[in-house]
Amino acid sequence: MPGPTVVRFTARVVGRVQGVGFRDYVRTRGRRLGLVGTATNMPDGAVVVIAEGGAPACQNLARLLVTGHTPGWTDRVEVVWQRAQGDLADFRRK
């Protein structure tokens, strides 16, 4: 039986998400879900999350970003779904 479909998403998270432990939260949750990716602070105060792995796990992480049960708060989350690229090896905070 084949495993879950592997997907990738990029999420731009806007709100109070820098300096509050948000990237560490995303990295920890992503690793627990078996995902690889990055959580990167942007100059405008947003955080960009790139995650890749099984579709159900990616959907779970994307849902966590939107619900607001994260350090700080989110005003807006823009998620773009893509094909997996296979270029990530771990979940890192940048």
UniProtKB/Swiss-Prot annotation:
| Disulphide connectivity of cysteines | none
Q: If you read the UniProt record, what top EC class would you report for this enzyme, in one word?
A: hydrolase
Which lineage?
Bacteria, Bacillati, Actinomycetota, Actinomycetes, Frankiales
PROSITE patterns per the UniProt record, alphabetical: ACYLPHOSPHATASE_1 (PS00150), ACYLPHOSPHATASE_3 (PS51160)
Spell out the catalytic residues.
23, 41
Protein name according to UniProt: Acylphosphatase
Acylphosphatase-like domain segment(s): 8-94
The record's similarity note reads: Belongs to the acylphosphatase family.
Q: Which PANTHER family match?
A: ACYLPHOSPHATASE (PTHR47268:SF4)
